[in-house]
């Protein structure tokens, strides 16, 4: 399988001069380089970047690895849609957020997760989840929705059928892209998981035990993760 690391966001909460995917771990290793090398064991790896942050990634990756998706601010779903349109893959694809530290356990989960005509989402049960996923609804806490005390949180990685994702992304854009911007009930971006809320795409939840979630939003969260690994 090929992998796409999504690293084209605005990172408004990270507060750093460099993209958060390029943050350095305590051991001096660059996060995106580590994740690239890990995912490379499963197949070719590509990284989405924006017009603004491409120059930072070129210090570590060649142009063939980078997929420029334009200006930031259109959301993770838009970046996935544009990357698939450029790559035109004919097999299942791993989509991975750039703000996660990938471990051997993550690779094991990706290798063993089912592949369907839709989205397979490895999840784990969490107390007070930041994002809460069910097969038919995704709650986004960052947009102020009331969240359950316990729920299933994604592991920042997904296995997708590129044909289904492209088809339902087009359906989403037809309905929610107006005047040069996305517009949904929770914001003005196309979140990748909006496909669950707003299209009839098939979803398989793979509940995973014994795995640490090394994802982050802020610099402090990254610093804490870097000390743990």
Where are these regions (language model features)?
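Conserved N-terminal catalytic core of the sugar/cofactor nucleotidyltransferase
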Residues: 2-5, 13, 29-97, 102-107
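Conserved alpha/beta core of the MobA/IspD/sugar-nucleotide pyrophosphorylase nucleotidyltransferase superfamily
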Residues: 3, 151-229
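A conserved hydrophobic helix/loop-capping motif in glycosyltransferases and polysaccharide synthases
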Residues: 4-8, 24
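Short glycine-enriched, charge-decorated loop/helix-capping segments at active-site entrances
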Residues: 18-24
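Conserved core of the sugar-phosphate nucleotidyltransferase
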Residues: 103-182
């Amino acid at each position: 399988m090929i992998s796409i690391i999504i690293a084209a966001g605005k990172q408004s909460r990270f507060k750093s001069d460099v993209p958060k995917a390029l943050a350095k771990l305590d051991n001096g290793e660059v996060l995106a380089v580590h994740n690239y090398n890990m995912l490379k064991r499963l197949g070719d790896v590509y990284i989405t970047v924006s017009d603004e942050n491409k120059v930072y990634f070129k210090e570590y990756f060649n142009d063939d690895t980078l997929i420029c998706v334009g200006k930031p601010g259109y959301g993770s779903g838009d970046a996935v849609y544009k990357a698939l349109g450029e790559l035109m893959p004919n097999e299942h694809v791993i989509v991975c957020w750039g703000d996660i530290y990938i471990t051997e356990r993550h690779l094991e989960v990706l290798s063993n997760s089912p592949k369907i005509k839709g989205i397979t989402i490895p999840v784990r049960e969490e107390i007070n989840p930041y994002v809460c996923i069910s097969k038919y609804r995704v709650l986004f806490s960052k947009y102020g929705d009331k969240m359950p005390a316990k729920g299933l949180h994604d592991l920042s990685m997904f296995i997708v059928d590129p044909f289904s994702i492209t088809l339902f992304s087009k359906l989403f854009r037809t309905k929610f892209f107006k005047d040069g911007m996305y517009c949904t009930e929770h914001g003005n971006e196309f979140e990748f998981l909006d496909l669950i809320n707003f299209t009839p795409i098939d979803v398989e939840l793979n509940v995973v035990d014994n795995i640490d979630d090394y994802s982050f939003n802020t610099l402090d969260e990254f610093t804490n993760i870097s000390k743990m690994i």
